[in-house]
């Protein structure tokens, strides 16, 4: 007599390296340029803002919530230099090489709970298993930001994304 045994994979934990803190400098008086090497008005940023999959299974990553502090107001259209637009900020986090479009509101973050994707696919980004030969187990990210009026030199604010990472 035979007996078939069926195994079910039950992944109960994952290991991921996520950036806890990073800084950037933004110049409201600069010239707005958004391209692979132009980050709006952000002049300097962390060189390694990266998520790394340390698990043996593939994962997905997205941003599911964004919080702000320091009086900043996240918007999805380019702020003017008028006082009515004081401390308005267009802000995006994208996979390196993916550029947000100025005219595409969905490319820019808003505060609160909303799914936000690191590339243009409209879906969570796939991270290959640890040790992927092509580096697909890591995603390098770049920050894009545009702000104009309402700031003093040395002022600070925070944008805090919540990364949701799941088994693929």
Please state what every model-predicted region is.
Residues 1, 17-21:
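Proline-rich low-complexity regions
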Residues 1-10, 43, 49-56, 114-168:
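C-terminal, structured domain-capping segment
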Residues 3-10, 23-114:
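Surface-exposed interaction patch
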Residues 8-18:
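Proline/serine/threonine-rich low-complexity linkers at boundaries of modular beta-sandwich domains
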Residues 20, 24, 28-30, 122, ...:
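Solvent-exposed, flexible loop/coil residues
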């Amino acid at each position: 007599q035979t007996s078939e045994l069926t195994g079910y994979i039950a992944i109960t934990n994952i290991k991921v390296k996520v950036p806890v803190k990073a800084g950037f400098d933004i110049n409201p008086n600069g010239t707005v340029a958004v391209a692979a090497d132009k980050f709006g008005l952000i002049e300097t940023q962390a060189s390694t803002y990266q998520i790394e999959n340390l698990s043996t299974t593939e994962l997905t990553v997205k941003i599911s919530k964004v919080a702000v502090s320091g009086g900043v107001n996240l918007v999805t259209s380019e702020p003017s230099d008028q006082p009515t637009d004081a401390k308005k900020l267009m802000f995006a986090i994208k996979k390196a090489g993916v550029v947000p479009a100025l005219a595409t509101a969905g490319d820019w973050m808003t505060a609160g709970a909303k799914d936000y994707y690191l590339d243009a696919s409209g879906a969570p980004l796939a991270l290959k298993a640890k040790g992927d030969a092509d580096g697909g187990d890591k995603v390098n990210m770049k920050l894009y930001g545009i702000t104009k009026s309402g700031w003093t030199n040395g002022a600070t604010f925070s944008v805090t994304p919540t990364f949701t990472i799941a088994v693929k």
